[in-house]
Amino acid sequence: MPNEIFTINLNAQAIIPEAFILLGIVGTLLVDLAGEKTASKWAPSICYLSIGSSLLSLTLQWNNPVESAFLGSFNSDNLAIAFRAIIALSTLVSLLISWRYTEQSGSPIGEFAAIVLSATLGAMLLCGSTDLISVFISLETLSVASYLLSGYLKRDPRSSEAALKYLLVGSAAAAVYLYGSSFLYGLSGSTNLTTIGLEIINKPSFITSLALVFVLSTVAFKIAAVPFHQWTPDVYEGSPTPVVAFLSVGSKTAGFAFAIRILSTTFSSFDEEWKLLFTILAILSMALGNVVALAQTSMKRMLAYSSIGQAGFVMIGIVSGTQDGLSAAVLYLAAYLFMNLGAFSCVILFSLRTGSDRILDYSGLYQKDPLITLGLSLCLLSLGGLPPMLGFFGKIYLFFAGWANHQYLLVIVGLVTSVISIYYYISVIKMMVVKEPQEASEIVKSYPEVNWGIAGLPPLRVALYTCVAVTALGGILSNPLFKLANTAVSETPFLQDVIAAANNIS
């Protein structure tokens, strides 16, 4: 037995990107112990080095995947690499836009960075987890760090309320996942997702269907799909804005990665059932998310409901289940990273200078801060799907893939709700560019002079310029990005097996 233990090949190189993130966590905690002044100086550099090294190692793994690691509990295939890269990039941008906000709020920077990196670690591990136990550990690592981040402004009652709500709903979602997992283990005698899928093929039963519903409920909570979205607006409104920016992209991306993996492996024999449930979730998310966003007066609440609608669009690609559909879903999540975090960069800048989050307070902003106005306008137009922005091409790929797979209802609902979303996005833009000075809000009239030299603002500026540039140059970037997304799907064996099986049935 001891000899067998030493001959086990764990293929630990699969998690080298996560190892760099872990080193970053240790580094930020150590500088935090040295005092706030030392942490403020060194924590950002440690984070950049950690995330940069992680992204570099992911690049080196691309097309050289480690298919099975840690006795089959983790796969570093191309799909996992793509999702982990999106999460790492979202963390990098979220940190760039958070330094000034964290410093101004009087919160410890080293501690904040360590928790953000911990959430990133959990999210990245979730993307490649192929075992019920590793999924749960990754899920809880992400969730616990997210609860801490939501309540990070300890002296703000809204932040504490957001953390408590998130904790209660998240704990319920974790319990539901464990209950569903216990059914799957009882039916198959295994915790490996692929093995479970093979064992339950010939065991269609009420218990299996119940397990599917429970697991799908956890997925829906993670991606904030209706009707599991109730936590989203309150948590987004009460949490620190940089935290909201990270959760809206990083957490959602991890949720979709988990959804694709478990639905395509464990529940591949229940293809019609989960696609029907996902279709219902997508329609409800697109409709409710975009309609309720019309009535919002808070910018963060509006973006919260917008993110619910955006999740519905991504689900179109997953429901189609084709090569183009899954590639379009990956592409849209990459596009969503830049256009959503670009919008949040502008919201954070406005909040830092005015302390306000009300949409009405943006009236006349063009006269005092043309940069925020231009950046926010471009990102909102991209979220609405207007050409020639990156979001337009992302939606086009999704709608074409859905239509080709005969998902006509989903595509029609997607088109209608996209038009609805354009209305509330353009309403914000119209408000910012009012012509008459007297129409400007009182907040804008007393708007401070723009000074980019303040500590913490140069990184935010870099993030803003980068996100807006990528969003605006969508026409040039969409094709190479789609090719990368297509490679992520075509070079992932379990997805090719599922796509081939679906083609044979059709």
From Swiss-Prot:
It is a multi-pass membrane protein. It comes from the Bacteria. InterPro entries: NADH-Q_OxRdtase_suN/2, ND/Mrp_TM. Keywords: Membrane, NAD, NADP, Plastoquinone, Quinone, Thylakoid, Translocase, Transmembrane, Transmembrane helix, Transport. GO terms for cellular component: plasma membrane-derived thylakoid membrane. The chain crosses the membrane at residues 14-34, 42-62, 79-99, 108-128, 132-152, 167-187, 206-226, 240-260, 276-296, 302-322, 330-350, 374-394, 409-429. One of its GO terms (biological process) is ATP synthesis coupled electron transport. GO terms for molecular function: NADH dehydrogenase (ubiquinone) activity; quinone binding. It is found in: Cellular thylakoid membrane. Its EC number is 7.1.1.-. It catalyses: a plastoquinone + NADH + (n+1) H(+)(in) = a plastoquinol + NAD(+) + n H(+)(out); a plastoquinone + NADPH + (n+1) H(+)(in) = a plastoquinol + NADP(+) + n H(+)(out). Belongs to the complex I subunit 2 family. NDH-1 shuttles electrons from an unknown electron donor, via FMN and iron-sulfur (Fe-S) centers, to quinones in the respiratory and/or the photosynthetic chain. The immediate electron acceptor for the enzyme in this species is believed to be plastoquinone. Couples the redox reaction to proton translocation, and thus conserves the redox energy in a proton gradient. Cyanobacterial NDH-1 also plays a role in inorganic carbon-concentration. NCBIfam families: NDH_I_N (TIGR01770), PRK02504.1 (NF002701). NDH-1 can be composed of about 15 different subunits; different subcomplexes with different compositions have been identified which probably have different functions. This is NAD(P)H-quinone oxidoreductase subunit 2.
